[in-house]
């Protein structure tokens, strides 16, 4: 089975939904952020602080390039990975890209106590700008799911329904 890539802003539920979806489809779950943390031996926030965002984005690109040649994966991408046009096109060539679309208010509410999100340390106006910029690429996904006010299980069922229709 071809891969399923979950994209969306941080806090949209990609990892939570991805694990449930992979289990339902009997596919392997891959979390790009976790892969990077394992390979680098440090947390994402530490990579950002010590090596910078551009270094981290390059690590993301390398991971997605390594994965696209495999099959049978449900992949949780980092929020910035799916917002990169080249990465989006690469993922669409070899699978279904599912955008978990949530409002900025939902993101802020879900992540208000999360200290491990470097981008959330920026002023709210900067976060809003980033949110809007990323949506321009997320919109190119094959499937869009409104993930506001839904449980992870409800989101998974909606993804399964939409994938079956394709």
UniProtKB/Swiss-Prot annotation:
Subcellular localization is given as: Cytoplasm
Which reactions appear under catalytic activity for this entry? shikimate + ATP = 3-phosphoshikimate + ADP + H(+)
Return the broad EC class: transferase
- Return the GO cellular component terms, semicolon-separated: cytosol
Q: Name one Pfam family in it.
A: SKI
Its domain of life?
A: Bacteria
Q: Name one GO biological process term.
A: amino acid biosynthetic process
User: What function does the entry list?
Assistant: Catalyzes the specific phosphorylation of the 3-hydroxyl group of shikimic acid using ATP as a cosubstrate.
Family assignment?
Answer: Belongs to the shikimate kinase family.
Self-association and partners: Monomer.
Its recorded name reads Shikimate kinase
